[in-house]
Amino acid sequence: MPLEKTNTHDSTATVEDQEATDNPMHLTQSRMLDLAGNPNRTTSRQSETLFPNGVDLNYPFTTTRGPPDVAEYNLETAEGVYRDPTINEGEEELVTWELNDPENPHNWSRLWKWYITIVNSLLVVCSAFGSSVIAGDLEDVSRDLKVGPEVANLSCSLMVVGFGIGPLVISPLSEMIGRRIVYLVTLMIYIVLQIPCALAPNIACLLIVRFFCGCFGCTPLTLAGGVISDVWETRERGLAIAFFAAGPYAGPTLGPLVGGWIGVGTGDFRWIFWVNMIYMFVMYLTLLPVPETYAPVLLRWRAQRIRKETGRQVFTAQEKQMLSFKEIVQVNLTRPLTLLLTEPILVCISGYIALIYALLYGYFFAYPNVFVKGKGYNEGITGLMFIPILVGVVGALSTTPFLEKQYMAKLDANNGKSVPEWRLVGMCIASPFIPTGLLIFAWTSFPRLIWIGPAFSGAPFGYGMVLFYFSANNYLIDVYQNYCASALAAKTMVRSAGGAAFPLFIDYMMDGMTRQWAFFLLGMVAVAAIPIPFTFYLFGDKIRARSKAAIV
């Protein structure tokens, strides 16, 4: 499926607006946007089946691949249906929300929206926590299963690999059958998989199951942003998205802290998996009251109900236009790889995010090297050294609403037309903090020096990490508005590859080069990457003009 150039950029979308905008099933939704009231909106592809005679831009419900905008699925009419003159199907009508429709997630109470937001954000933390919690007691894994540390490290890496593969199936599946059922089924499987992890008789069993834990446990990381977009209007969701953005990094940071104390207290790494199972099960119970939030699925259910009860021919565009299996595979697998090979913006931003994510997972193995091997601390005390990273995460969490407010002010001043490079402010602020933390860690990690230096190096790193991630996701969504799900899928694959790879060689790197020079080298790599957001801020418009997928 060739990439189609578009000049649509009137989006006010923020991060995760949806993380599946160009998912195959998402492409087939009736885009419920009144184009008469939004004249800047254009369609990049006219449907051959739903609109055989072309699309009149004076009518709503045109099939478009424009910017991700939740309002597209929020058109309200007095009767809850709209007869689109572009459909030559007699009396068939398209279903909409009714005025002030109580089933429309945007009309739910703020208290209920915040419950959904907090539950989804905590599920992200819980899922990410599960990937790194075993890092707190890998020494016991090596001893009990009689393997070397490099093999034991795979129990962390393979779950992160699963994080990169699982979304390729989970994302399109959620668009077809709804987010809730995918959440409930996959997380229950994830909970059950903790049992063979805890009872694993050998390392092969543990590693295989940990990979599948990543494939099924990635659901919150994949869907939570979309759920938040489902229930909040664009201008309301800044703080909600900030909570979500912290989760993928707060969770892994908490893992070694908790896992270390479990290992110290029990002397058995298997208890880590029992505790993780209990933790996710408690979170699973909080998810049960949350209903389906994805508007296209809710409207499809409504159309089916109306047809069954009244015989009235009411449909959604999703029902009228289905993609072939080949198209589904093409969008979800081929396009992310195509973008990675052809889009310099995506390559650079994804590579930067992968570096940060890899460094975070590198810390999980660097801290034991410094504090256990170098200073003689136990795993529990070493876990406490991750607290400054969490302090930095909280600092970034406090900053993101101000960035959103600044962005919205620029948007209003520009008559609602966005410039993607406005999103780069947060990345420009964040990028110097990352090498700062690494260099502090490098030259304070001598065994003879007090613990404060290497421990508190995590604060600037944690701050820059989350602030960069938040802004980078926003930027990719704004740049690749028509293909943002593919862009984000590509970013996730690269990020997961980085996070999975670093634990496999970081110990060798520190032992071979010394801790100081190893992290000095990594710090210099991060310094070399600082110009990336500044370059795109200055020249991003020119780079986008040469792109086949980015908006101009």
Swiss-Prot record:
Q: How does it sit in the membrane?
A: Multi-pass membrane protein
Which Pfam family, just one, is annotated for this protein?
A: MFS_1
UniProt entry keywords in alphabetical sequence: Membrane, Transmembrane, Transmembrane helix, Transport
**One term under GO cellular component:** fungal-type vacuole membrane
CDD domains (UniProt xref): MFS_Tpo1_MDR_like
Query: What GO biological process term is on the record, naming one?
Result: export across plasma membrane
Listed GO MF terms:
spermine transmembrane transporter activity
Kindly list any coiled-coil regions of this protein: none
| Family, similarity comment | Belongs to the major facilitator superfamily.
Protein name per the record: Uncharacterized MFS-type transporter SPBC409.08
Q: What is the protein's species of origin? A: Schizosaccharomyces pombe (strain 972 / ATCC 24843) (Fission yeast)
